[in-house]
Amino acid sequence: MIVDDSAIVRQVMQAILNKDPGIEVISAVADPIFAMNRMAIQWPDVIVLDIEMPRMDGVTFLRKIMAERPTPVVICSTLTDKGAETTMQALSAGAVSIVTKPKIGLKDFIQDAASDITNAVKAAAKANMSNIRAPKAAVKVREKNGVESLIPCGASAMSKTTEHVVAIGTSTGGTQALEFLLKALPTNAPGIVVVQHMPEKFTASFAERLDSICDIRVSEARHNDRVLPGHALIAPGGKHMMLKRSGAQYLVEIIDGPLVNRHKPSVDVLFRSTAKCAGKNAVGFILTGMGDDGARGLKDMLDAGAPTIAQDEKSCVVFGMPKEAIALGAAGKILPLAQIPQEIMRYAHLKD
């Protein structure tokens, strides 16, 4: 089902999805009220949902769906700061992935992004909705303008050099998995670098949201940011992130370049660079997601002496990326999501 107040979007998206023999669009409606009437007759397997619509917004509709009958939802959002912020609310409420659209040139854009849209719907159709977690804990508000923020970056960084790096890669279902994982970590966690498949603009909002609810710091990575204990760096959408070493410091390098495994940022790019410059001083985790991005990079990490862990099938929203890594022999361990925070801290204490 397509729910979008733009007739052009509905028309073009319906034509694109119906071209795939594995997809049937049962309806394309202008707003959530029409959608609910239609769903009373026939419930869809996947919903492609706009955010900003008349009569009822997409996030409100999404919450109603998740309360009544959890269903895979792909958010179709405009590439704006406001759209990114609202989309983060939708992902937190249970949406599984994002497809972006511009404010102008919609028809041409959707045609160009046909494969991305089709792949997003197919990935959503495989989602295990029992593993989509709505936030259970209240948002923790943490003061960020105190003494810590007044210490010059260089001084605090040099005194808090991380010797260990945790590299994490994830895609579909990863926003919920990362929220669960990072919220569980204490402030003495090792430095963390993350690739979450997500479009540009959205990663900044995602990092800000995580930072507001986690004890550790979370931010969108910038070129030459240091990897520090108690801090997670999220790769910016539309760029690759690589780990590099400068003396005793680990830094991240943010670069442009071609898509790798159809993605930018790519998990393989992060994992391979981590294997090269951190070796056995790193640990790699591949979490829920569609496709095979990260499998070969995780194998490189394992071959370089790093512990490597894949999320198990039962706890994944989509068991794609971990499955490929396991099949390649890249995973030294297979663990449920609930045990991964403890595994990160166990690794940190073993290395101390």
Curated annotation (Swiss-Prot):
Residues annotated as domain CheB-type methylesterase: 159-351
GO BP field: chemotaxis
Keywords for the protein's UniProt record, in alphabetical order: Chemotaxis, Cytoplasm, Hydrolase, Phosphoprotein
Keyword Cytoplasm: yes
Entry EC number(s): 3.1.1.61, 3.5.1.44
InterPro entries: CheB-like (IPR008248), CheB_C (IPR035909), CheY-like_superfamily (IPR011006), Sig_transdc_resp-reg_Me-estase (IPR000673), Sig_transdc_resp-reg_receiver (IPR001789)
Subcellular location: Cytoplasm
Active-site residues, Swiss-Prot/TrEMBL: 171, 197, 293
Free-text description of this protein's post-translational modifications in UniProt: Phosphorylated by CheA. Phosphorylation of the N-terminal regulatory domain activates the methylesterase activity.
Single GO term (MF): protein-glutamine glutaminase activity
Residue stretches making up the Response regulatory domain: 1-116
One of the Pfam families matching this protein, by short name: CheB_methylest
Top EC class, one word: hydrolase
Reaction equations catalysed: [protein]-L-glutamate 5-O-methyl ester + H2O = L-glutamyl-[protein] + methanol + H(+); L-glutaminyl-[protein] + H2O = L-glutamyl-[protein] + NH4(+)
Function: Involved in chemotaxis. Part of a chemotaxis signal transduction system that modulates chemotaxis in response to various stimuli. Catalyzes the demethylation of specific methylglutamate residues introduced into the chemoreceptors (methyl-accepting chemotaxis proteins or MCP) by CheR. Also mediates the irreversible deamidation of specific glutamine residues to glutamic acid.
Family: Belongs to the CheB family.
Domain notes: Contains a C-terminal catalytic domain, and an N-terminal region which modulates catalytic activity.
Protein name per its UniProtKB record: Protein-glutamate methylesterase/protein-glutamine glutaminase 2
Biological source species: Shewanella denitrificans (strain OS217 / ATCC BAA-1090 / DSM 15013)
